[in-house]
Design a protein with these regions (language model features):
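Active-site environment of divalent metal-dependent phosphoester hydrolases
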Residues: 28-32, 56-61, 78-84, 107-112, ...
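Conserved beta-sheet core of the metallophosphoesterase superfamily
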Residues: 72, 110-175
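Helix-adjacent hinge/juxtasegments
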Residues: 72-110
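Pre-active-site segment of Zn-dependent metallo-hydrolases
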Residues: 27, 31-43, 102-103, 107-119
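Well-ordered alpha/beta subsegment
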Residues: 180-181
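Beta-strand-turn-beta hairpins that frame and shape the catalytic cleft
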Residues: 12-22, 92-101, 139-145, 169-177
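Active-site neighborhood of phospho(di)ester-bond hydrolases with catalytic His/Asp-centered motifs
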Residues: 23-25, 49-55, 72-77, 101-104, ...
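N-terminal active-site segment of His-dependent metallophosphoesterases
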Residues: 2-71, 79-89, 160-162
Length: 181
């Protein structure tokens, strides 16, 4: 079972029956991009909070995103000791009665079997992950597995567009959306 640590988010605004979460991963700032693309700030303009699924490379990414909303993040394989010392490998947040897990690389390259195990072991209704730089939405039964892709370094280049994702959560449902930028 993966070790789960918690970051504390400020209390979410109580008003509204739907929470919108901005999902982002694999920003690689400043190694592969000088900054987060401006389009990300437009897409995330009215989110309740932001989830970053790792490979920030520099903590300034969190500072930049926090201009919009609170940020919940995990470290990725390209994040150095400073980031690994501040962020957990696995994180989660409960929105209404939905438990949303965050992890950079839950063996996504080997299919959903390992991701399904992680979701079941941790009681996740949804698992946000990164690492592949390629966006995807997959449902396995009633479990959601979503990769927002990369806004700075999509793979494969020239075929895959830079992307982020939005997750709209209500008491009744979770609705994922990939947004190309």
């Amino acid at each position: 079972m993966a070790t789960e640590q918690s970051q504390v988010l400020p209390k979410l605004r109580e008003m509204g029956s739907t929470k919108t979460i901005g999902l982002i991963s694999d920003t690689h700032v400043p190694a592969r991009a000088r900054e987060i693309p401006k389009e990300v700030f437009v897409v995330f303009e009215s989110v309740d909070f932001i989830v970053h699924a790792g490979d920030l490379v520099d903590l300034s990414v969190i500072d930049d995103l926090e201009q919009l909303a609170p940020v919940l993040a995990v470290y990725g394989n390209m994040d150095g000791p400073e980031i690994r010392g501040k962020l957990p490998k696995v994180n989660s947040v409960k929105v209404f009665d939905w438990k949303i897990g965050i992890m950079h690389n839950p063996s996504a390259l080997f299919g959903t079997r390992k991701m399904r195990e992680i979701a079941l072991q941790n009681g996740f209704d949804a698992l946000v992950f990164g690492h592949t730089h390629s966006s995807s939405i997959r449902w396995e039964g009633n479990k959601l597995f979503i990769n927002p892709g990369s806004p700075t370094n999509p793979v494969p280049p020239f075929i895959t567009k830079p992307s982020v994702a939005l997750l709209r959560v209500s008491k009744e449902r979770i609705a994922p959306e990939i947004v190309q930028i």
